Amino acid sequence: MLAGLVGFSRTATGAHYPSDVAAGFILGGAVAAVGRRLVPPASSPTRSQPQELDHVAPRPAGEGVTLVVNPASHSGRGAALSSGLRRRLPRMRIVEITPEDDVAAVMAAAAADAEVLAVAGGDGTVRAAAQAAIDHDLPLAVFPAGTFNHFARAVGTFPAARTVRAIQRGTVGRVDVAYVNDEIFLNTASIGAYTDFVRVREKLEKTIGKPLAALVAGWRVMSKNRSVAVTVDGRTRDSSLLFLGNGQYRPQGFAPRSRDDLQDGLLDLRILDVSTRGARIVALRAILTGQLGRVKQYHEISAPELEIALPNGPARVARDGEVGELVDVLRVRSARRALTVYRTRRSR
């Protein structure tokens, strides 16, 4: 309605010809339609699955909590956050990671001397903290201090005030984690070009919006990267984009953004073959029309365990956006309800 009033005013005052305004409406409508196909609107928080909460000892001043902070996260956001937390949870012990530290070793040492392990950093730092918490049978408190904070958003501890409330009230829940070759991930894992796709898309989102960012990122990745042969359930496919989710993501298609249920015990495997120009055109058209699930280049598999072989040689695996080692087989499994995290009733 607002756009219509603006268009009318521009025509009435003579600032634009009616044909210019009409063309603008058509172009805007087309972009909106494409955007809804590429990145469907987020569902209302009330539609997410209810998550069970357990109660542990309240810690109103942070008693027994050890917080490991990555001060370099998100241009110093970690350091700024820890300063504020000292006032809210004055009895909490704080450990800062230095550039020379082995993050996993710091987490393990902190967990060995804590009743609650807390972490302030990006998804990679949180991943290391989660493994230490599981190894020492401790609850984990996640303070969002990274760039995107995917896991903190998923468990409902964004912004940080929610984590503070959960610690003070003693409310926790259990969530799934997943492993690729016995290395943990909390959100996603991938091989091939998917990590590049996410990096480009998220870099552009704030400047050109999510729909166009997804389109540009997809085209760049499709044009530059070679496919990787993958064998799953005895069938070999050429994969240009391969996504693995800890839990089932929504929406369907190749722009997964969020999870409704963090306790479903499932892996979400999505494979897209855009290794040839013809395949890229078919995939792009399917994305624009919302028909990606119907084209032969796209495949989805949900299972608690998967084995993915790379018959043509090793590729580099990424976990939660951090690029790791070269592998020629991915043994992936879900560990259902393996991690206890502080969270509030609201899941989003």
Q: What spans do the regions from the language model cover?
A:
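Catalytic core of DAGKc-family lipid kinases
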Residues: 78, 97, 134-240, 246
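Internal helical hairpin/lid segments
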Residues: 240-292
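ATP/NTP phosphate-donor binding region
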Residues: 31, 35-120, 127, 348
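Glycine-rich, charged/polar anion/phosphate-binding loops
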Residues: 52-53, 214-218, 225-231, 251-257, ...
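Short hydrophobic-aromatic micro-motifs
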Residues: 183-189, 195-196, 237-245, 250-252, ...
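Membrane-embedded catalytic cores of phosphoryl/pyrophosphoryl-handling enzymes
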Residues: 1-54
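Short, high-confidence coil segments that cap the C-terminus of an alpha-helix
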Residues: 114-115, 172, 303
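ATP/nucleoside-binding phosphotransfer catalytic cores, i.e., glycine-rich phosphate-binding loops
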Residues: 234-236, 271-348
